[in-house]
Regions:
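A short linear hydrophobic-aromatic micro-motif
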Residues: 86-88, 226, 347-351, 473-474
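Short amphipathic beta-strand starts and helix->beta connectors
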Residues: 306-313, 343-348, 431-439
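Conserved N-terminal alpha-helix of the aminotransferase class I/II PLP-enzyme fold
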Residues: 51-94
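N-terminal "arm"/small-domain region of PLP-dependent enzymes with the aminotransferase-like
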Residues: 1-69, 444
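Conserved PLP-enzyme active-site core in the AAT-like
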Residues: 13-18, 22-24, 42-44, 94-312
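Conserved PLP-binding catalytic core of the aspartate aminotransferase-like
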Residues: 288-343, 358-376, 380, 401-419, ...
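PLP-dependent enzyme catalytic core of the Aspartate aminotransferase-like
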Residues: 351-489
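Short acidic (Asp/Glu) and glycine-rich catalytic loops that position anionic groups and cofactors
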Residues: 250-254, 272-281, 318-323, 352-358, ...
Length: 489
């Protein structure tokens, strides 16, 4: 079969949408604002040029669910750019795509190997599919207070212990830009006949600069979900699913994808994916290369500021993404909340605050000016803390406040647990009951207990120890943890 030659400069869906709007049809269809005429004045003033492109579903503009024309070509162009066999665009974010990957590959009572520290969409996918989770051991760096991802050795031991597993879901890279030995892991899974799914939400920029880690698709993964909007130029909640090889059922992926996407997709969102793909095809190496340069410039600048430090690949990770910059302020004598507050006073908004550090992301949207603004703010904060005498009282090391997580005991699959009635009882009475909520602490950001798991004495003691240290549970209905939600017997 002859390989199709794609014109990566083209934007077929954008061209179709623009052409349709130029026709100036009089709309007797949804949406109700009728190309902006019925929109609130504030909305018209704000989005007057965009509103004519916010159109209802119609055959003239192709169909996200069953594309045959320009949108089909747009997805084919995305697959071609990334070297995939197929691509599926999403207007429901990577959340829907992660659920799609799970539901398309594992079913009721089938086993899926996953990290403990996964996005909540994985749990949703387990509920929808009925699959049984098998957890990889969690690794946590106590100095930096972050998850490291699974090791190859842990994956091998888990595979040995669970030969019944049908698929593996890996997170690569993680929120902090930390990678895993993805190539060796994929090879090990494939050797045993398992399907490899990858949550690559934070990695759509990886193929465009040699200083960045190998992307999951090149490493051999079967299905890869990317948040195109996170590090590239499409609009928020737009994402891309990429598939390759013969281990997956493409018809089933398409069927599940149709189930989980809105039947009223926003055409502006869809067009932004086409634009972002064309931008990377024509300018990707230049744009991403510049972002990587700026990230290294920022790192060098931070290292020269008293009281601040930043993590790099020499300290922790294989396959490290330098555009994720973790800034630690413990030596300034302030925690992450105070650090973030001071940054906001300087009009700097960060991606994440956790424990004693903040995370900033450098993308194709950054510039010399934005980097200099951040460095200026950091220098001024450092000087402020020095003048306040905070340097003399640094924040304690994280290894003084982190506790070893107890091993989870799964009693019911997430799906089984989801459909059981729940009740709230006192924590003191909860030992031996099945948990009806998922509870985590930050750090380490790894679930202490999830829905369907047994509440053991070790779990209760962990809660008490964390509470004594002043930590607040995430995900608990009762933040004081005097009570806890459990499944009814």
């Amino acid at each position: 079969m002859t390989k199709k030659n794609y014109n990566q400069v083209s934007m077929p869906y954008v061209d179709l949408l623009k052409s349709y709007v130029k026709e100036r049809f009089i709309p007797f269809h949804t949406p109700g604002h009728k190309i902006g005429h019925g929109a609130p004045k504030d909305l018209r003033d704000w989005m007057s040029e965009a509103l004519p492109y916010d159109l209802g579903v119609m055959y003239a503009l192709d169909d996200l669910h069953e594309p045959e024309g320009a949108f089909k070509e747009a997805q084919e162009l995305a697959a071609d750019l990334y070297g995939a066999k197929a691509a599926w665009y999403s207007v429901n974010g990577t959340t829907a795509l992660i659920m799609t990957m799970i539901m398309a590959t594992v079913g009721e009572e089938e086993s899926l190997i996953i990290p403990r520290e996964v996005h909540k969409s994985v749990m949703s996918g387990l509920v929808m599919s009925g699959a049984k989770p098998i957890y990889l051991p969690s690794r946590f760096d106590e100095e930096w207070g972050i998850q490291l991802g699974a090791s190859l050795e842990d994956l091998v031991s888990t595979l040995d212990a669970h030969p019944e597993a049908k698929a593996v879901l890996l997170v690569y890279p993680n929120y902090y830009g930390l990678g895993i030995d993805i190539e060796a892991m994929v090879a090990e899974c494939h050797k045993r006949g398992l399907i490899v799914l990858v949550d690559e939400a934070h990695g759509p920029h990886l193929p465009f600069d040699d200083r960045l880690p190998v992307e999951a698709l090149e490493a051999g993964a079967d299905l890869v979900a990317q948040s195109t909007h996170k590090s590239l130029g499409s609009l928020t909640q737009t994402s891309t699913l990429l598939g390759q090889g013969d281990r997956i059922d493409y018809r089933r992926v398409t069927q599940v994808h149709q189930m989980l996407q809105s039947t009223s997709p926003n055409y502006i969102f869809m067009a932004s994916l086409d634009m972002a793909r064309q931008q990377m095809a024509t300018e990707g190496p230049n744009l991403v290369g510049k972002a990587v340069d700026l990230a290294y410039q920022l790192r060098t600048g931070i290292q020269a500021i008293p009281g601040l430090k930043t993590m790099d690949e020499s300290q922790l990770a294989k396959n490290f993404d330098p555009t994720k910059v973790l800034i630690d302020a413990r030596d300034l004598g302030i925690d992450a909340v105070a650090f973030e507050r001071r940054l906001r006073d300087h009009k700097i908004e960060v991606e994440l605050i956790q424990a004693c550090h903040v995370l900033v992301t450098i993308t194709i949207g950054d510039s010399e000016a934005s980097i200099q603004a951040l460095l200026t703010a950091l220098k001024e904060i450092s000087q402020e803390c020095l003048e306040e005498g905070r340097y003399s009282s640094p924040i304690p090391s994280l290894d003084q406040v982190n506790l070893a997580l107890p091993e989870p005991i799964l009693i019911k699959t997430p799906r089984q647990a989801f459909y059981v009635s729940r009740e709230t009882i006192h924590l003191a009475e909860a030992c031996g009951r099945i948990c009806g909520e998922t509870i985590s602490y930050y750090p380490p950001g790894i679930p202490l207990i999830s829905i369907g798991e047994e509440i053991t004495p070790a779990v209760i003691q962990y809660m008490k120890d964390k509470q004594a240290l002043g930590y607040v549970p995430n995900g608990a209905a009762d933040m004081s943890l005097e009570t806890i939600v459990v499944l009814k017997d």
